[in-house]
């Protein structure tokens, strides 16, 4: 038993280090995907909106600019940073099971689920650290440089502390959903389209169907966003903490289904290879 646990821990450790190596480098997705999409984009939009709002508040007496509170200060970080990390993790999982990389993984990781765990750990920790740093940075910058509009933003308030804790938790859950969905779908483009389509189209458009607002209570990304403390018109009956727990539960379920799907595909591929080998022997 101890030997088995040590072997599993070793595989997960190697897989996590491999993912960190894979995501870094001069031409990696870190520089061309994560930094622009998960860091620069939300910062640029947040500061751009803040600059315009502060300008109007300073020069115009005919236009009233509403002050922004803490609970609405990191919306773009939640919207872009969390989702970009989930998409990158999903793409990494989908591509890891295909082509030469997939062939190598079948030999290096006989327990196929350890590869998924490694990716959830690697990208989940990265998403948590990145989102926490951006949340802290944004809530520190806004009231300091844009006081007319963002004076009410307080990183030390209950809402600010919740953001610092809950946004990284939501990011980890979103990465788990992405990895699980990628393992189920098994195709990079299909996974990315499905993930973005669900998060940005279905979860919002479902309110237009009969009983749509009831169905919307069960949307994982909306629950996760609400669970961070972000102001939303969407208000599930189980409250913010319940929304975050629900999002985490969906992530665990999808991840488990993804592990089962990867194991099943590996078994089918192995069966076809053994069958093909027997046929070649008979032909000889």
Residue ranges and their predicted role:
Residues 3-9, 27-92, 116-186, 201-204, ...:
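Secretory targeting signals
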Residues 86-108:
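Transmembrane helix boundary and interhelical loop/hinge segments in multi-pass membrane proteins
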Residues 2-6, 246-284:
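Junction motif at the cytosolic side of a transmembrane helix
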Residues 9-27:
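A short amphipathic helical element positioned immediately N-terminal to and/or at the very start
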Residues 109-122, 194:
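Amphipathic cytosolic juxtamembrane alpha-helices at the membrane-cytosol interface
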Residues 42-46, 188-222:
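Transmembrane helix segments
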Residues 50-55, 97, 101, 141, ...:
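Membrane-interfacial segments
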Residues 33, 103, 116, 192-193:
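Hydrophobic/aromatic positions within or immediately flanking transmembrane alpha-helices
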